[in-house]
């Protein structure tokens, strides 16, 4: 049964306070599922390890060449480490057994960072805090997705029946593991509800650390860019209106357009162009003319691990339908499939391999929004995008609901479908450019028709501020 949440919260805060006062004299151990890739879980572990730098890290498999964050740390592995990394997805029962018999009862404080089996370790009563990302997804929340595509390529045909056969036993073992931690901490309101649903345990939400500072410097650049692009767009619209007026007046044998007004527009555009190149140090060779400047900064972006449940196929299909440019950055089992899906549209879809953080920041400078079509417990990448002043178009489920403010720092779409995402892209473009209608389902409408007062996106600097509560500083506090 789930205990009273306020009582649990107070007890957890009290215990954390007690441990924090004694941490210099405590014998502390850290545990994680594996250290073979760089991801959100590993980032959480890195921040916790900085708080307890002398604590050993227990894990099932470790590959320092794949993740170099823990060089010099006391990383301890067992017999599973002799197996190749690619076997990680095959050995769930072995990994459960490994952690089940890992005895850490000699430690005064054990912190497991787990979305899988690390929570199974043995500890003495009252010492085990589990920072649980979400109940093991391929046993619980995403069994349908894993059944459809277990992620083993041509071996899927053999894996599916084995998965169905083992699932009841794996679930039973996972529930046994879930009973071992004394206290649960988790990453989002969504993850909290999943832990309550499947494990019948109460969890305290502490948002995971995001390196906000590294990305927030992009927001200032984007603020200048977006402001100038919007000015350009405004003048383009004014020019179009004047040209339309000229056509109508000529057609009706009326006086020609007011040349003085037209010359004013041309002068303003020249001044804007000079201001752009002077203020943000952009070379004129980068764009043919001022009208094309906005087009350079006119693509959507996603950088993530490319796996089936991320639903990056939706982003590609929606952008092709809407004739919108999209840049996908990353690698994974779906990489080649995504390339094949987009190969007929090289003018719209660009797929790049995994890039460095500095390279990603350069792409964020020119992106108008991050597309986040997956249902995830949290989502580090979209928060990094927000920190860079880049709004997010997100599926209206999962951890995104903790940081997306609809029509302020992003736009939600309600169904994990191409049509729903297309409607969100149209809505976003309306808010971004403030120039066109959008369609939601079969109904064509405008934001002003939906709301009593006009709603528009925050500026890049304001968007960046909405990500500040997810900083590493806040996490450590």
Enumerate the language-model features and the residues they cover.
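Active-site donor-binding segments of glycosyltransferases and PAPS-dependent sulfotransferases
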Residues: 51-119
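Acidic donor-binding loop of glycosyltransferase active sites
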Residues: 365-377, 390
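A charged, aromatic-enriched C-terminal amphipathic alpha-helix characteristic of glycosyltransferases
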Residues: 92-97, 416, 440, 444-447, ...
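Short hydrophobic beta-strand element within catalytic cores of glycosyltransferases
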Residues: 391-395
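Membrane-proximal helix-turn-helix segments that form the acceptor-binding/catalytic region
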Residues: 151-184
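Nucleotide-activated donor-binding/catalytic signature segment of Leloir-type glycosyltransferases, i.e.
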Residues: 290, 336-358
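Conserved donor-binding/catalytic core segment of Leloir-type glycosyltransferases
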Residues: 225-230, 292-310, 316-323, 327
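Conserved acidic donor-binding segment of nucleotide-sugar-dependent glycosyltransferases
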Residues: 406-407, 411-419, 425-433
């Amino acid at each position: 049964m789930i205990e009273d949440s306020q009582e649990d919260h107070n007890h957890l805060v009290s215990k954390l306070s007690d441990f924090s006062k004694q941490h210099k004299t405590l014998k502390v151990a850290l545990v994680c599922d594996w250290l073979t890739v760089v991801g959100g879980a590993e980032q959480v572990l890195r921040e916790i390890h900085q708080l307890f730098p002398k604590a050993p890290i227990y894990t099932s498999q470790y590959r320092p060449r794949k993740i170099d964050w823990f060089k010099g740390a006391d990383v301890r592995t067992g017999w599973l480490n002799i197996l190749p990394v690619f076997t990680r997805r095959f050995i769930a029962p072995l990994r459960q057994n490994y952690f089940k018999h890992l005895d850490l009862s000699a430690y005064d404080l054990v912190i497991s960072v787990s979305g899988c089996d690390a929570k199974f370790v043995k500890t003495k009563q009252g010492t085990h805090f589990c920072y649980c990302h979400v109940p093991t997804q391929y046993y619980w929340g995403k069994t349908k997705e894993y059944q459809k595509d277990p992620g083993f390529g041509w071996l899927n045909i053999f894996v599916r029946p084995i998965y169905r056969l083992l699932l009841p036993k794996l679930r039973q073992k996972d529930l046994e593991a879930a009973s071992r931690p004394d206290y649960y901490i988790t990453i989002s309101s969504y993850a909290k509800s999943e832990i309550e649903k499947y494990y019948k345990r109460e969890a305290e939400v502490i948002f995971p650390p995001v390196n906000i500072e590294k990305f927030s410097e992009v927001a200032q650049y984007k603020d200048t860019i977006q402001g100038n692009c919007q000015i350009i767009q405004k003048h383009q619209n004014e020019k179009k209106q004047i040209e339309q007026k000229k056509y109508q007046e000529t057609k009706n044998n009326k006086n020609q357009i007011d040349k003085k007004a037209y010359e004013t527009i041309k002068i303003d555009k020249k001044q804007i162009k000079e201001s752009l190149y002077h203020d943000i140090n952009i070379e004129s060779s980068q764009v043919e003319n001022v009208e094309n400047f906005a087009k350079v900064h006119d693509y959507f972006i996603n950088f993530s691990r490319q796996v089936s449940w991320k639903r990056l196929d939706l982003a590609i299909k929606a952008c092709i339908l809407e004739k919108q440019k999209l840049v996908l950055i990353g690698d994974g089992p779906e990489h080649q499939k995504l390339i094949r899906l987009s190969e007929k549209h090289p003018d719209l879809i660009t797929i790049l391999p995994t890039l460095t953080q500095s390279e990603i920041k350069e792409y964020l400078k020119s992106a108008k929004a991050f597309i986040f079509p997956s249902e995830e417990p949290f989502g580090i990448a979209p928060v990094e995008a927000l920190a860079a002043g880049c709004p997010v178009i997100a599926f209206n489920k999962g951890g995104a609901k903790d940081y997306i403010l609809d029509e302020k720092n992003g736009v939600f779409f309600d169904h994990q479908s191409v049509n729903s995402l297309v409607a969100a892209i149209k809505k976003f473009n309306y808010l971004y450019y403030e120039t066109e209608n959008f369609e939601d389902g079969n109904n064509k409408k405008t934001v002003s028709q939906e709301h009593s007062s006009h709603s528009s996106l925050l500026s890049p600097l304001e968007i960046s501020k909405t990500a500040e509560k997810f900083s590493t500083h806040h996490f450590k506090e």
